[in-house]
Amino acid sequence: DNFSTRYLVNAASKKLSVPLISASAIGFQGQLLMVDADSACYECLFPKEQHDNEGLRCAESGVLATTPVMIASLQAHHTLLFLGLNLSPLKSKLLLWDGLTLKQRILHFEKDTNCPICQASLSVN
């Protein structure tokens, strides 16, 4: 529910080359993505300068109690795949889950060549 923290954790993940499996939920919808040293990052997908930090928040918009449970389950499953089998099916992909239709979509996204986080991690690594 805190976009500033999402951007800070993303930057730390890239700088330290520590994988990040990020999840979020609002209303009936959820998102899940994975960031690692070689992949596109959270800021590539959601550029900070284009993001309205006063956007949707669960406190104002609400969230169905089961939505975070579903997204957390997907996040835990993906984490176990990564840690146990070294699989990362969501690397540079965004999983969108819709709790009204019970459908999910997976969108591929590329590194943004102008992303300040990815550029900074190149100079560190």
Whereabouts are the PLM-identified features?
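Glycine-rich phosphate/adenylate-binding loop
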Residues: D1-N125
